[in-house]
Amino acid sequence: MRYELYYWPTIQGRGEFVRLALEEAGADYVDVARRRGKRGVPAMMTLIEGARIARPPFVPPFLRAGKLVIGQTANILLYLGGRLGLAPRDEAGRLWVHQLQLTITDLVVLIHDTHHPITGYLYYEEQRAAAKLATKHFWRHRLPKFLRYFERVLDKSGGPYVLGRKLSYVDLSLFQILEGLRYAFPKRMKRF
């Protein structure tokens, strides 16, 4: 099956977590909004507006898989995980990696809020003072708590990945989190 990924063409954002899973698995997919002309962003906007679809997505990223349209990063990864060999096949295992991905989703919100603590509608420069305060608290309190949790998960797994010796979409998402932090906070991340 050829998957269609819909996400903004010029940023990695939440769509990158899905892209990494698709790429790692060697899945057949097209990044729709990166197409030119009407087949790109306008095609994505048509689905968002929902005139031709019974269950329209709210915002990107979303994935079209045959007749299904699946929104929300963690939900997309839950769907793709077993199909791409990036999640366990048993229910308990699938729910475990989904739980970890939802925890990553919480962390993504906190990371975003270091640059946009007041609102996403203002540029960073317009909320710089609040961003500095949010960043201070993020680094002092929130990020260490999340990192300790994922270190514990990895320690208990018995292998280099959250599932032990098998790579999962959560491992790819943790990679993306760390790379994103290195990009957004290069000086602070040198300490890690």
Language-model regions: role of each:
Residues 97, 161-188:
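GST superfamily/GST-like fold recognition
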Residues 86, 152-165:
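Surface-exposed helix-capping loop/turn segments at secondary-structure junctions
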Residues 1-137, 141:
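GST-like domain detector, emphasizing the conserved glutathione-binding G-site
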Residues 65-67, 164, 190-192:
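Conserved, non-catalytic sequence blocks in retroelement Pol enzymes and Pol-derived host proteins
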Residues 81, 151-155, 178:
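Amphipathic, well-packed alpha-helical segments that form the structural scaffold of globular domains
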Residues 136-155:
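Amphipathic alpha-helical packing segments from all-alpha helical-bundle domains
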Residues 103-106, 152, 180:
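Glycine-rich, acidic and aromatic/proline-enriched surface loops and short helix-turn segments
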Residues 130, 185-192:
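A short acidic/glycine-rich loop-to-helix N-cap element
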